[in-house]
């Protein structure tokens, strides 16, 4: 977990406290959106954010997984038809 904390940071004065890759202003959400669009890890670091490493891209995924595991989500149940 400490390695993840070294790769992802949250600072109230950077992107309004949204999680970013440490030492950058690149948000975790930006990277996840590229992955969702089908962009590969390699393409992210070669074409979109050359200052990043593939390890940092993977850290964004690990961070998202950690958030899902640590939070409770409540959804309204739909009534059966």
Model-derived segments and their meaning:
Residues 1-26:
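N-terminal first-folded block
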Residues 27-81:
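Long, charge-rich, low-complexity alpha-helical segments
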